């Protein structure tokens, strides 16, 4: 499966989500790193009614006439919009377009970038955990897929003044706190580092006290970066980033010229990095966080018959990790054995593109495939080379390859999934059918409108509007907040469902 962005348009289209069908709008987006403002024409579109009382005797008549005209205008507007709920799979008429239902979000912002970014990671900050107030702030690191190799960059971005989303009537919800009374435009600040070649994947160390990131380049090299000076420059106006800090602190060359996409840092052992390439080889590199020394292991883990697509360290066992491959398998490895995986299971009938290890339930692993199917596996029930392994849950909701999958950082039953069908879906596996909804042992799914779209009860939310969605992540310090990247730019949102 090719993970590269196919369309790299300089003019990015507006990203919208949780869609209704309404009138077509045209938006021109220019420049790099700009937040979109869906309300910028609000003042011009408002209509003001001016009442002139030339005679006291005519006052009641004039008021009745004005009220009648207002009601007629409102009725006409409602008839013209013809808004209805949209679900993937439904056909749109020629004059219809998808529009976001703002009331479905607590927060929704979209951001355009000059070049598409295939991958990113969210950085720890010092603003506290469990943040639920607005405006919000988030830090991310990402890398570009530019037109020419020397135009690529690693970007450290700070998104601030992320206000609570207005409802479709332009008002904030009734329970908004006082800090929403004065709404300001969102702010994007960034610092950049030149990167040789396109950036296939970016991963930041998960430890709070480390600001180290790794980038997988399409040149076959893996670069390590110290992001601390760039974050300080974003937080302290006037601070300059030394030229020496704009270069990698180390470059891993274990893969030769073979590029890859799979990469993961260990949460249990700081500094341990895994990288997997298109030749099916996996290498481990160790960074000593105390003195900065880097030790690449030149002997790879071998066994996959095709490209390694994703890697995940075990959240509980220091020397165990999982890999998935285009050979349709998931393998569980012990770092003491490089020639043979401890467990090898064929989990899909096509390329296994992504995996995610549940951090709250370490025996749960989710996988997403090239055929649009994603599954949840209980590792305790899997056996070596099982012919027909049975997942505890599997869904074929997405109509194109699964491109990203990630468990919620604190809720073990919630999963986010992204697909090449331009959908991001949020699932809650704690939701089950009531007994009354089950007939003759067969689960009865909801049928939605004339399109006959079956909606699983575990599906909590469908976010759309981005084109060519590549990757998503939950924000660990803002509960329910998701950030995603696509060919059309970034979205940062928080729904009312999760």
Residue ranges and their predicted role:
Residues 2-5, 9-192, 220-252, 286-296, ...:
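Beta-propeller domains
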Residues 110-123, 192-199, 255-258, 398-402, ...:
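Repeat-based blade/solenoid architectures
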Residues 116, 136, 150, 198, ...:
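Beta-rich catalytic cores
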Residues 124-127, 133-136, 206-209, 267-269, ...:
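Residue-level detector of Asp-centered blade-edge/turn motifs that repeat once per structural unit
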Residues 140, 213, 273, 321, ...:
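Hydrophobic beta-strand positions that form the internal "hydrophobic ladder"
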Residues 160-164, 180-184, 219-249, 266-364, ...:
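Per-blade loop-tip surfaces of WD-repeat and WD-like beta-propellers in eukaryotic adaptors/scaffolds
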Residues 471-498:
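Blade-level signature of beta-propeller repeat domains, shared across WD40, Kelch, NHL, RCC1
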């Amino acid at each position: 499966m090719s993970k590269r962005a196919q369309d790299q348009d300089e003019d990015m289209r507006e990203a919208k989500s949780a869609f209704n069908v309404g009138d077509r709008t045209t938006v021109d987006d220019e420049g790099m790193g700009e937040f979109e403002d869906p309300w910028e024409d609000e003042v011009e579109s408002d209509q003001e009614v001016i009442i002139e009382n030339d005679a006291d005797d005519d006052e009641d008549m004039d008021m009745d006439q004005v009220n009648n005209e207002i009601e007629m205008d409102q009725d006409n507007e409602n008839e013209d919009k013809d808004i209805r709920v949209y679900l993937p799979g439904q056909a749109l008429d020629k004059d219809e377009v998808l529009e976001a239902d703002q009331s479905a979000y607590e927060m929704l912002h979209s951001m355009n970038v000059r070049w598409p970014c295939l991958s990113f990671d969210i950085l720890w900050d010092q603003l506290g955990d469990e943040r639920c107030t607005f405006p919000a702030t988030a830090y991310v690191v990402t890398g570009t897929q530019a037109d020419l190799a020397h135009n690529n960059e690693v970007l450290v971005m700070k998104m601030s003044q992320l206000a609570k989303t207005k409802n479709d009537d332009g008002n904030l919800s009734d329970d908004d706190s006082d800090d929403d009374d004065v709404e300001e435009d969102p702010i994007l600040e960034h610092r950049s580092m030149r990167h040789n070649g396109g950036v296939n994947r970016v991963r930041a160390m998960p430890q709070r006290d480390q600001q180290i990131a790794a980038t997988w380049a399409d040149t076959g090299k893996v670069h390590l970066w110290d992001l601390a000076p760039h974050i300080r420059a974003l937080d302290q106006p006037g601070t300059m980033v030394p030229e020496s800090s704009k270069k990698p602190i180390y470059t891993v060359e274990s893969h030769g010229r073979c590029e890859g996409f799979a990469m993961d840092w260990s949460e249990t052992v700081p500094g341990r990095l895994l990288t997997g390439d298109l030749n099916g080889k996996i290498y481990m590199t160790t960074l000593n966080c105390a003195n900065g020394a880097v030790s690449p292991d030149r002997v790879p883990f071998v066994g996959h018959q095709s490209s390694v697509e994703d890697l995940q360290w075990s959240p509980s066992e220091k020397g165990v990790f999982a890999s998935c491959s285009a050979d349709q398998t998931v393998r569980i490895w012990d770092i003491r054995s490089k020639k043979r995986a401890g467990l090898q299971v064929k989990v899909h009938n096509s390329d296994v593109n992504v995996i995610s290890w549940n951090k709250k339930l370490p025996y749960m692993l989710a996988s997403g495939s090239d055929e649009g199917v994603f599954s949840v596996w209980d590792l305790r029930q899997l056996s070596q080379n099982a012919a027909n392994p049975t997942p505890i849950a599997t869904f074929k909701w997405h109509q194109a390859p699964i491109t990203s999958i990630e468990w919620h950082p604190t809720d073990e039953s919630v999963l986010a999934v992204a697909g090449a069908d331009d959908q991001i879906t949020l699932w809650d596996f704690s939701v089950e059918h009531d007994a009354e909804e089950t007939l003759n042992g067969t689960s009865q799914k909801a049928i939605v409108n004339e399109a006959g779209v079956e909606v699983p009860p575990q599906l909590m939310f469908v976010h759309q509007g981005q084109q060519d969605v590549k990757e998503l992540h939950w924000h660990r310090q803002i509960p329910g907040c998701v950030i995603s990247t696509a060919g059309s730019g970034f979205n940062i949102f928080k729904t009312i469902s999760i």
